[in-house]
Amino acid sequence: RYSSRRMSCTDNLAIFWEKGFGNDLAAPPDLEGHPMAVDLENLKYQLERFYLFYRDSLKFVKPGSQSEKYRMMSMIQYSLEGTAYGGDYDQVIGAFWATPNRLQDKRLNAVAHELGHSFQLQSIADGEGVAWGGNGIFEMGAQWMLWQVNPHWIDDETYHWDAFKKNTHKAFLHTENIYRSPYILEYWSERQGLPFIGELFRQGKKGEDPVMTYKRMQNLSQEQFNDEMFDAYQHLINFDYKRVFSI
């Protein structure tokens, strides 16, 4: 299915593609009349750019991570399913899987999101943190990571913003908003620094949800947390975030 003969590497990632593509990702056979070509050079460029930002600026992995020993892996599937998902291989190294129709936009938003999951799971593979709080914080976190490397994410996926505006009454981490609302994470990172979100993931404990972890890390009472959330949403009314105004 996969082979080192159908592989291309950056400094930090190995990209494999399935046998159906043949040896050249730029000129594979169509599948059921659908073109399957992938711009490998753009994929390599963007993957390495995302990787370096997640590692060096967001600090989602710490020194000694297994990602220093192994390349993360990108697996391209010869399929029309339209799937993309991030995780890890054997609880050792981060990886993600995608089909060509998720790799067509030049900014590769789906790749940025799924590589975010690869880094989230890399922390766990490295023995830091647990998969706590359900999938909500993982999806919200991956959207926030995407937004860091593509400041035009809201313009690219305006449907998320439009849907969120109709659902602002729903609780933080409500499952209907997890792809739409990385704004609390933006607020926290603005107050505590970009690496704080990665540390939040590492600090998670069984029996906690992300709010409990955050309150413990910041030594906040429930009343203090409520006041902070109110302040966060006051900022959101005018999109009053330093990074957003700098774009």
Regions found by a protein language model. Give the residues of each.
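Beta/coil-rich, acidic/histidine-enriched accessory regions frequently appended to metallopeptidases
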Residues: 208-247
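Post-HExxH zinc-binding segment in Zn-dependent metallohydrolases
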Residues: 131-175, 182, 187
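Residue-level recognition of short, structured coil/turn motifs
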Residues: 59, 124, 150-154, 193, ...
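N-terminal low-structure segments adjacent to metalloprotease catalytic domains
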Residues: 1-10
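Juxtacatalytic substrate-recognition/specificity segment
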Residues: 11-134, 138-142, 152-155
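An acidic- and aromatic-residue-enriched active-site/binding cleft used to recognize and process polar
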Residues: 79, 123-125, 147, 163-166, ...
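Contiguous mid-protein beta-loop-alpha structural module that forms a pocket-lining wall or clamp
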Residues: 177-178, 182-210, 224, 230
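Generic structural signal for hydrophobic core residues of well-folded globular domains
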Residues: 119, 145, 149, 188-192, ...
